[in-house]
């Protein structure tokens, strides 16, 4: 007889909401990475590409947890992408997405704690910690732009030109 772990329906709902956030973030960071690379801001683009991949790893962990509970990972619904049209807007859009994700993960971790689902709580707390690092990074970038100006900030991130076949 096979034992299937059934999860609290609200926990699975939180996991799917988190999955939606992460899937949206994958696409948003990837598109922003492509914009930055296209604008010649290759050093900055590398960071955004790495963030997109990290969001994919988050989505994978959430999917794994949903399946553990014999739930259905909903990958068909995304939130609207927040797309920046310039460097500062990209940072602001990504910061808004990260703040939204952090709030969801904080709420979800609290619910999971009350439901005595400590493993899922720990997953949400780990995701929240990662998002807080992203938030700190993005806020620092906006602070730099405010202090040194957008022109100097973008000049700092032009890189990868030597030997590039672009």
What do the predicted segments below correspond to?
Residues 1-166:
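Iron-associated oxidoreductase/ferritin-like identity signal
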């Amino acid at each position: 007889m096979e034992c299937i772990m059934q999860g609290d329906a609200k926990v699975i709902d939180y996991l799917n909401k988190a999955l939606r956030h992460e899937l949206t973030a994958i696409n948003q960071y990837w598109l922003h990475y492509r914009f930055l690379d296209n604008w010649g801001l290759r050093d900055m683009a590398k960071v955004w590409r790495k963030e997109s991949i990290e969001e994919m790893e988050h989505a994978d962990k959430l999917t794994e947890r949903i399946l553990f509970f014999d739930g259905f990972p909903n990958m068909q619904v995304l939130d609207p992408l927040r797309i920046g049209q310039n460097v500062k807007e990209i940072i602001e859009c990504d910061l808004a997405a990260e703040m939204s994700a952090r709030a969801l993960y904080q709420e979800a971790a609290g619910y999971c704690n009350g439901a005595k689902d400590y493993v899922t709580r720990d997953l949400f707390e780990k995701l929240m910690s990662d998002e807080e690092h992203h938030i700190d990074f993005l806020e620092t970038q906006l602070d730099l732009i405010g202090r040194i100006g957008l022109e100097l900030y973008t000049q700092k991130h032009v890189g990868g030109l030597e030997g590039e076949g672009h």
